[in-house]
């Protein structure tokens, strides 16, 4: 019997409609028939520690920047016309952007890279600090100093620029980025421009609104607010989120650059991309494209936002206001921040971190991907075709190469489990994943799957200059595998090498812009139906194989600390999408 799973058919589960019976009522994934080996109900990792109030925002004045606390004096306690909280620092302080310098995974990874490549320590620390500690790095470079993170560098409480470093990706950095060469290679990898030679109070600080009122900010923080259309342009985000890192050969010689993350270039090669000559004001999107800010800094639905608490009378409420949510997909690290907020000295309370985490979960489960199933039975063989649709404007998983997503498919009969592929394990491993079981190997991309130890994992696998699998960024010369889900409209055959598809997916005609089709062929033996087919798209921020490689440097303080935090954290993946069908 043939069963199609569509929005109007037997069952369809994107995240807008949870698991459903034909009636459309919510039903637990294990409600019909025997429970699967692993539940496929909606899930995401949970925090394990008690609530904490959080420290105050960072307050400092340096040559070119001010701390977030100074900005919060006027830009907190904001509401839209319906009374919803629009406070900028209230939303920002619990994001990964605000905590970019305190992210313990990042700190551990940078320390590991430096230890493995000591000859280019200065290059590594400057490259990483430029986007994770951007105010301190920019201030140092403006004074012709040496950017340093460890030992007596920015991480030392005694360092002159410690406060500005620990304020992360903060207000007076992003809003001072000049409209110079944005969207070009000359601005990527942290090559943003700030007018460090301009003295107060004439130093420009950019916003998305025309004809700003200048005098309040000139007097309070020494900036002159001016209209800057770049603040509503993905190219501004691309200055750090298009990152090429140097790599070395086995002898330690720098041999080239590697595209560590390229979501802006992926976006530009998709239906979501907006041409540079079509830059538009906030709230005035004229076409089918969508900027980074429209997803990651969603507008107030109600409008009527007074953007400053002490606003001069001529400053009118704004109907288009970008909430500083900076929502991404990093649920796991937000949990780690919650679990360790005191030791990390976070400015965000437990509740604010929870708010950001819940926004992240909602984005993953409502706006990221959809699953659909078509299934049929012929004798003792079931054929199940799983379709995965990517709804975001870049590859998914996105950005840093530690992330992966995979299909967990389980088939049950009244007698028990018939077949299961991609079962998540409690320690974060994936049953059947070669990389988890045999170091130096990896799971290939599949068009068709017939064995339980074959798993469709959407990920990147990196190789060094000798062609061996590596998890050391500064040894990575190329991708052996990149089958991450492509955005709609992405033409893989004409993609530039830095955003290409690598491995078996490059030749898979069922893997293309916006979707992937995976066919499962399952022998039922002497088991009788009805058969319940359940599929889930699961997502993890740090793959176990990536983490196991980091453990090699557990003698380093930052690595030791993060290993401890990782080991006690909840490692269950986020359920991004689910689908279910019955075959009789």
Regions found by a protein language model. Name each.
Residues 3-17:
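Bacterial N-terminal signal peptides
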Residues 13-32:
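Signal peptide processing junction and immediate N-terminal pro/mature segment
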Residues 71, 106-127, 137:
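N-terminal catalytic scaffold of extracellular/periplasmic and nuclease hydrolases
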């Amino acid at each position: 019997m043939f069963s199609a799973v569509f929005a109007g058919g037997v069952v369809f589960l994107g995240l807008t409609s949870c698991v459903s019976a034909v009636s459309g009522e919510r039903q637990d994934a294990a409600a019909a028939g025997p429970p699967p080996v692993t539940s496929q109900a909606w899930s995401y990792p949970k925090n394990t520690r008690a609530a904490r109030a959080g420290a105050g925002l960072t307050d400092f004045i340096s040559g070119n920047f001010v701390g977030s606390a100074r900005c919060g004096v006027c830009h907190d306690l904001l509401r839209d016309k319906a009374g919803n909280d629009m406070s900028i620092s209230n939303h920002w302080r619990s994001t990964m952007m605000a905590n970019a310098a305190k992210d313990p995974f990042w700190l551990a990874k940078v320390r590991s890279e430096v230890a493995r490549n000591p000859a280019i320590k200065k290059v590594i620390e400057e490259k990483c600090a430029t986007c994770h500690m951007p105010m301190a790095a920019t201030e140092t470079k403006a004074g012709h100093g040496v950017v340093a993170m460890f030992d007596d560098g920015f991480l030392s409480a005694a360092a002159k620029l410690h406060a500005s470093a620990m304020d992360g990706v903060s207000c007076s950095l992003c809003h001072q980025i000049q409209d110079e060469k944005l969207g070009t290679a000359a601005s990527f990898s942290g090559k943003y421009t700030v007018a460090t030679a301009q003295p107060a109070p004439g130093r420009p600080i950019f916003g998305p609104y025309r004809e700003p009122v200048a005098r309040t900010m000139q007097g309070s923080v020494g900036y002159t607010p001016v209209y800057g259309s770049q603040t509503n342009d993905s190219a501004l985000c691309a200055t750090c989120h298009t990152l090429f890192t140097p790599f070395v050969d086995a002898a330690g010689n720098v041999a080239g650059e590697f595209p560590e993350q390229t979501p802006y270039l992926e976006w530009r090669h998709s239906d979501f991309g907006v041409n540079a000559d079509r830059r538009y004001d906030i709230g005035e999107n004229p076409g089918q494209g969508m900027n980074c800010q429209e997803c990651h800094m969603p507008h107030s639905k109600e409008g009527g936002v007074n953007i400053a608490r002490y606003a001069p009378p001529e400053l009118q409420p704004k109907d288009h206001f970008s909430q500083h949510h900076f929502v991404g997909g990093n649920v796991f690290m937000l949990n780690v921040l919650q679990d360790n907020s005191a030791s990390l000295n976070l400015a965000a309370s437990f509740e604010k971190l929870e708010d950001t985490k819940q926004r992240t979960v909602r984005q993953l489960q409502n706006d990221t991907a959809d699953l659909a199933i078509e299934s049929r039975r012929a004798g003792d063989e079931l054929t199940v075709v799983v379709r995965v649709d990517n709804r975001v404007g870049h590859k998914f998983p996105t950005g840093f190469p530690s992330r992966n997503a995979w299909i967990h498919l389980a088939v049950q009969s009244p007698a028990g489990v018939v077949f299961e592929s991609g079962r998540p394990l409690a320690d974060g491993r994936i049953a059947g994943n070669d990389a988890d079981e045999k170091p130096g190997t990896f799971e290939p991309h599949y068009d068709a799957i017939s064995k339980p130890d074959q798993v469709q994992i959407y990920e990147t696998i990196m190789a060094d200059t000798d062609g061996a699998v590596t998890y050391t960024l500064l040894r990575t010369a190329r991708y052996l595998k990149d089958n991450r889900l492509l955005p709609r409209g992405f033409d893989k055959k004409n993609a530039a090498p830095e955003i290409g598809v690598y491995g078996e997916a490059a030749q898979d005609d069922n893997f293309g812009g916006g979707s992937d089709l995976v066919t499962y062929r399952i022998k039922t033996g002497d088991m009788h139906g009805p058969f319940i087919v359940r599929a889930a798209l699961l997502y993890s921020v740090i793959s176990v194989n990536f983490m196991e490689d980091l453990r090699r440097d557990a003698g380093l303080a930052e690595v030791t600390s993060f290993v401890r935090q990782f080991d006690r954290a909840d490692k269950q993946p986020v359920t991004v999408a689910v689908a279910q069908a019955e075959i009789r």
